[in-house]
Amino acid sequence: MELLCCEGTRHAPRAGPDPRLLGDQRVLQSLLRLEERYVPRASYFQCVQKEIKPHMRKMLAYWMLEVCEEQRCEEDVFPLAMNYLDRYLSCVPTRKAQLQLLGTVCLLLASKLRETTPLTIEKLCIYTDQAVAPWQLREWEVLVLGKLKWDLAAVIAHDFLALILHRLSLPSDRQALVKKHAQTFLALCATDYTFAMYPPSMIATGSIGAAVLGLGACSMSADELTELLAGITGTEVDCLRACQEQIEAALRESLREAAQTAPSPVPKAPRGSSSQGPSQTSTPTDVTAIHL
């Protein structure tokens, strides 16, 4: 007897883009007014934290990103979790032994807000190799919520992507690819503390600019595109250009690190043999697939 499994990949129901909502200037202006509320005011490594260092934050961020990729989370779950992490660390001194616990709680909260089916406590504990117990997650969930004043609906860079792309009027066959590359840049920025105090709109605008120029998705020059993007979000041209250059530099550094740690190449399969490609996820394109 043969059994056939017809179960497909889990897909969350999605609403189609609303041109009136995307084109309404009040929506963009509302996000621009609110974004500063969710940006850390100063470097917490200098003012608040004594044990935690920038490289520890980066290691935690990469682990959190891997969890999101494994669980095929929505692309805005990881940046939102990093926003919670930075806001908490900017006001509460934390021991380095508690850092993974804090990151796990932030993932739990972000998935509850942005996922159709949130990550479970049990599953997150497995990802920590049982270093975090379920009761710790529950206790710290309440603690983090209190320190964030229950204000979880943070404005992040991902919220600006659709609004900016709608105003760029790119060719329809390039929009999806530009958005996917921009999402990769946003995930990369979230792992780097250098961008933690940048306004989300500037990070989103710089990521889209880097993606458009890297893909050659429009006929405008780099200066013309930068001026157009700066006008959309009301950003100073020089600041936006510096942010975009910093994003591209972070990408080059990430590619260099990936090349150093890359495994040896796998021999090609004999001709005629079939191999199953990786399934599509809702997480961004891998950073090694980006070309400037």
Swiss-Prot record:
Pfam families: Cyclin_C, Cyclin_N. The modification Phosphoserine is found at S264, S279. SMART domains: CYCLIN (SM00385), Cyclin_C (SM01332). The modification Phosphothreonine is found at T283. PROSITE patterns: CYCLINS. GO terms for cellular component: cyclin D3-CDK4 complex; cyclin D3-CDK6 complex; cytoplasm; nucleoplasm; nucleus. Phosphorylation at Thr-283 by MAP kinases is required for ubiquitination and degradation by the DCX(AMBRA1) complex. Residues 256-292 are annotated as: Disordered. Residues 27-152 form the Cyclin N-terminal domain. It is found in: Nucleus; Cytoplasm. InterPro entries: Cyclin, Cyclin-like_dom, Cyclin-like_sf, Cyclin_C-dom, Cyclin_N, Cyclins_cyclin-box. GO terms for molecular function: cyclin-dependent protein serine/threonine kinase activator activity; cyclin-dependent protein serine/threonine kinase activity; protein kinase binding. It comes from the Eukaryota. Keywords: Cell cycle, Cell division, Cyclin, Cytoplasm, Nucleus, Phosphoprotein, Transcription, Transcription regulation, Ubl conjugation. Transmembrane segments: none annotated. Residues 272-285 have a biased composition (Low complexity). GO terms for biological process: cell division; G1/S transition of mitotic cell cycle; negative regulation of transcription by RNA polymerase II; regulation of cell cycle; regulation of cell population proliferation; signal transduction; T cell proliferation. Regulatory component of the cyclin D3-CDK4 (DC) complex that phosphorylates and inhibits members of the retinoblastoma (RB) protein family including RB1 and regulates the cell-cycle during G(1)/S transition. Phosphorylation of RB1 allows dissociation of the transcription factor E2F from the RB/E2F complex and the subsequent transcription of E2F target genes which are responsible for the progression through the G(1) phase. Hypophosphorylates RB1 in early G(1) phase. Cyclin D-CDK4 complexes are major integrators of various mitogenenic and antimitogenic signals. Belongs to the cyclin family. Cyclin D subfamily. Interacts with the CDK4 and CDK6 protein kinases to form a serine/threonine kinase holoenzyme complex. The cyclin subunit imparts substrate specificity to the complex. Interacts with ATF5. Interacts with EIF3K. Component of the ternary complex cyclin D/CDK4/CDKN1B required for nuclear translocation and modulation of CDK4-mediated kinase activity. Can form similar complexes with either CDKN1A or CDKN2A. This is G1/S-specific cyclin-D3. It comes from Mus musculus (Mouse).
